Regions:
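P-loop/Walker A NTP-binding module and the surrounding RecA-like catalytic core of P-loop NTPases
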Residues: 144-147, 173-394
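Non-catalytic terminal/linker segments enriched in charged/polar, low-complexity residues
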Residues: 1-175, 193, 220
Length: 394
């Protein structure tokens, strides 16, 4: 599935460990010293002192965080997997993709049926466009995207002299594909080491589960992953992410009740010291209207950049595909606060509001990296504009 990975490694990286708890079965791999050239973890508190007014004091949280105090840390270090020196793009098995496309079409069936019903006429006239307008609005495509698509469709019909509803449907599929095409971009891993990915979203969007799935796919693609459990508020959030860390045999940095920004700093610093390829930072769910929590997200972002000058390299927002136009509002709010680089759309299995991606493409075209249609690992796949367009129209 991850044929989009682009990795620039000139040599095989080795991992060092110190000042952390190592499980007995892996103790033989833990004797390698940490290269001090990467980062010093002795006293980074001063770096985030200026942010201590938001979300708690930075320095004490650093002292309690996963890296600096092993007794408060839940860290797991699996046997190292030596990454390949060069990773070529991997071809995804066609059968797996075909099965997923079937699930996507099934998931968007309610949306597709509404739009397909508009083509149940015998001729192409103004009534057809009126039915399409109603169908697109019901699918939560939004006023702007609906008006744009209808104008584009009429131009295509005129230029091609289309005369049947079947021909018009094909032209609409082309119009939707062209509208969604700017959202189809690859997630690039390997340009920076580590690649720091910050993940945000509202409560219940499936953020932590999505991180777990993404971790599995990254690991299978030869990437060494470190998880940062910066959701220190939700009950059992740390434990839920720890379960995914155990399943995927990756390291996790966590601290009960610690400061999320301080923990994120420690996680990035630890990843630099141990030559990890990817850091996934899980943050607490919040509504855009909770301004103090949005300020905390900004603090986490600033603190990550102090641990690594170029980080975060990706800021992803997980949105629930069932929320329709509310998802667009979330994208706008989080983008203004964090400067989003990508989206992950979940829970598209059974939604009648799949047209919201058209609204996002028209009003806030943030790339969509992944689309989820279920709970299984293989249900999270890369976004393709043509495939989504065909599934959307039924």
């Amino acid at each position: 599935m991850f044929s989009f990975f682009k990795k620039k490694l000139s040599e095989v990286l080795q991992s060092g460990r110190e000042d952390v708890h190592t499980p007995p079965e892996q103790a033989s791999d833990a004797g390698m010293p940490v290269d001090e050239a990467f980062c010093s973890l002795d006293d980074p508190a001063g770096l985030i002192q200026e942010d201590s007014a938001i979300g708690g004091a930075g320095a004490p949280a650093l002292q309690e965080s996963a890296v600096s105090t092993p007794q408060e840390t839940h860290a797991r270090f699996p046997p190292e997997q030596t990454p390949p020196a060069v990773t070529e793009p991997q071809q995804e098995p066609e059968s797996d993709r075909s099965r997923w496309l079937g699930r996507l079409k099934t998931g968007l069936k309610r949306t597709g049926n509404t739009i397909s019903a508009a083509f149940g006429v015998s001729q192409v006239d103004e009534s057809l466009y009126e039915e399409l307008e109603s169908a697109l609005l019901m699918a939560d495509a939004g006023v702007q995207a609906t008006a744009y698509l209808l104008d584009d469709l009429k131009r295509r019909v005129k230029s091609t002299c289309a005369e049947t509803p079947v021909q018009v449907r094909a032209l609409l599929a082309d119009a939707v594909t062209d509208l969604l095409q700017p959202l189809q971009k690859p997630l690039v891993i390997g340009e920076y080491t580590p690649t720091v990915i910050m993940v945000a979203g509202v409560n219940g969007a499936g953020k932590t589960t999505t991180i777990g799935k993404l971790t599995r796919h990254l690991s299978e693609a030869g990437q060494s992953v470190l998880l940062a459990a910066a959701d220190t508020f939700r009950a059992a959030a740390r434990e839920q992410l720890s379960v995914w860390a155990d399943r995927n045999m990756v390291e996790i940095v966590s601290s009960a009740g610690g400061d999320p920004a301080a923990l994120s700093f420690d996680a990035v610093a630890a990843a630099k010291a141990r030559n990890k390829h990817v850091v996934l930072v899980d943050t607490a769910g919040r509504l855009p209207t909770q301004l103090h929590l949005m300020d905390e997200l900004k603090k986490i972002r600033r603190t990550i950049s102090k641990a690594c000058d170029t980080a975060p390299h990706e800021v992803l927002l997980v949105i629930d595909g069932n929320t329709g136009q509310n998802a667009l509002a979330q994208v706008k709010a989080f983008d203004e606060a964090l400067q989003l680089t990508g989206l992950i759309v979940t829970k598209l299995d059974g939604t009648a509001k799949g047209g919201v991606l058209c609204a996002i493409a028209r009003e806030r075209p943030v790339p969509v990296y992944f689309v989820g249609v279920g709970e299984k690992l293989e249900d999270l796949q890369t976004f393709n504009a043509r495939e989504f367009s065909e599934a959307l129209l039924g």
